[in-house]
Amino acid sequence: MSHTVKIYDTCIGCTQCVRACPTDVLEMVPWDGCKAGQIASSPRTEDCVGCKRCETACPTDFLSIRVYLGAETTRSMGLAY
């Protein structure tokens, strides 16, 4: 089943989500939008198993990373209406 991994610009570049991912879906890439100078990226979403460990690991008040599971993707992102 296909999942969507969305990373928001509230990412603080802490790498917690990258370290929490058991399937190495995430990696850090250079970004000037935060003090850390990097942001999470999801180049391998086809390997996402939907465990949402990345969401749990995210320390920001508004989760900077969200995993939308298969059919819930369009509904959760507000695209189904």
Curated annotation (Swiss-Prot):
Keywords assigned by UniProt, alphabetized: 4Fe-4S, Electron transport, Iron, Iron-sulfur, Membrane, Metal-binding, Oxidoreductase, Photosynthesis, Photosystem I, Repeat, Thylakoid, Transport
Record EC number: 1.97.1.12
Reaction(s) the record says it catalyses: reduced [plastocyanin] + hnu + oxidized [2Fe-2S]-[ferredoxin] = oxidized [plastocyanin] + reduced [2Fe-2S]-[ferredoxin]
Keyword Repressor listed: no
One BP term from GO: photosynthetic electron transport in photosystem I
Domain 4Fe-4S ferredoxin-type: 1-31, 37-68
Subcellular compartments: Cellular thylakoid membrane
Cofactor requirements of the protein: [4Fe-4S] cluster
GO cellular component, one term: photosystem I
Binding site for [4Fe-4S] cluster 2: C21, C48, C51, C54
Primary location: membrane
Record-linked PROSITE patterns: 4FE4S_FER_1, 4FE4S_FER_2
Segments passing through the bilayer: none
Disulfide bonds: none
Record note on cofactor: Binds 2 [4Fe-4S] clusters. Cluster 2 is most probably the spectroscopically characterized electron acceptor FA and cluster 1 is most probably FB.
UniProt topology in membrane: Peripheral membrane protein
Positions that bind [4Fe-4S] cluster 1: C11, C14, C17, C58
GO MF, one annotated term: electron transfer activity
Keyword Mitochondrion: no
Chain's role: Apoprotein for the two 4Fe-4S centers FA and FB of photosystem I (PSI); essential for photochemical activity. FB is the terminal electron acceptor of PSI, donating electrons to ferredoxin. The C-terminus interacts with PsaA/B/D and helps assemble the protein into the PSI complex. Required for binding of PsaD and PsaE to PSI. PSI is a plastocyanin/cytochrome c6-ferredoxin oxidoreductase, converting photonic excitation into a charge separation, which transfers an electron from the donor P700 chlorophyll pair to the spectroscopically characterized acceptors A0, A1, FX, FA and FB in turn.
Binding partners and assembly: The cyanobacterial PSI reaction center is composed of one copy each of PsaA,B,C,D,E,F,I,J,K,L,M and X, and forms trimeric complexes.
Protein's recorded name: Photosystem I iron-sulfur center
Organism: Acaryochloris marina (strain MBIC 11017)
